Amino acid sequence: AKKRSRSRKRSASRKRSRSRKRSASKKSSKKHVRKALAAGMKNHLLAHPKGSNNFILAKKKAPRRRRRVAKKVKKAPPKARRRVRVAKSRRSRTARSRRRR
């Protein structure tokens, strides 16, 4: 029997499924983000709409709107695998630059 391709269109009810959301949020955890960075996947990490330091691992074919790469990730150190904290909240950085002025 021919294996069915994975690119099958997902039904609306499947898209709303909790397990899918849960697996997505799991992948946005810092541990996953660090692992992905270490694997050189920084272009697949998108800024998460909700959290300051959550990222979503996105597929290359994600719609352009969702494909915006998180700014904080771009500057991630090459030693991301060993670093514990990768993402600092954006707010603290802007506050720091304001203080400097």
Curated annotation (Swiss-Prot):
Residues 32-65 are annotated as: Globular. Residues 3-22 are annotated as: 10 X 2 AA approximate tandem repeats of [SK]-R. The lineage of its organism: Eukaryota, Metazoa, Spiralia, Lophotrochozoa, Mollusca. Its main location: nucleus. Keywords: Chromosome, DNA-binding, Nucleus, Repeat. Transmembrane segments: none annotated. It comes from Ensis minor (Razor shell). GO terms for cellular component: chromosome; nucleus. This is Histone H1-like protein EM6. Sperm. It is found in: Nucleus; Chromosome. The keyword Magnesium does not apply. Residues 1-101 are annotated as: Disordered. GO terms for molecular function: DNA binding. Residues 1-35, 58-101 have a biased composition (Basic residues). Sequence repeats lie at residues 3-4, 5-6, 7-8, 9-10, 11-12, 13-14, 15-16, 17-18, 19-20, 21-22.
